[in-house]
Amino acid sequence: MSTIKVTDADVQETIQGNDLVLVDIWAPWCGPCLALAPVLEEVAKENPNVVVAKLNQDENPGTAQNYGVMGLPTMLLFKNGELVDRLMGNQPKPCLLYTS
């Protein structure tokens, strides 16, 4: 599966409707966010049991604010609708695989 785009309007539906969801909160001006994007695509394709959802913080500030996001990129891992882990900054693929 490829990554999916989510918004403030539908992110909760995605989180609640799937067992494992990794929400990548990013921005188009964020260099580390852009560097992380292909790694997240690989994680999504190699782990069909994990939904990798990308949320543009500039267009959707509500979710970032609700989860207290202070820096980008921030990845939030949800299991059965509950936040279970948080990663900040550009992460190597092994860290993302361990989290998911």
Give the label of every model feature segment.
Residues 19, 26-29, 71:
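Short pre-active-site segment immediately N-terminal to redox-active cysteine/selenocysteine motifs
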Residues 6, 41, 48-61:
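Thiol-based oxidoreductase modules, predominantly thioredoxin-like and allied folds used
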Residues 34-46:
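Typically the conserved alpha-helix immediately C-terminal to a functionally engaged Cys/Sec
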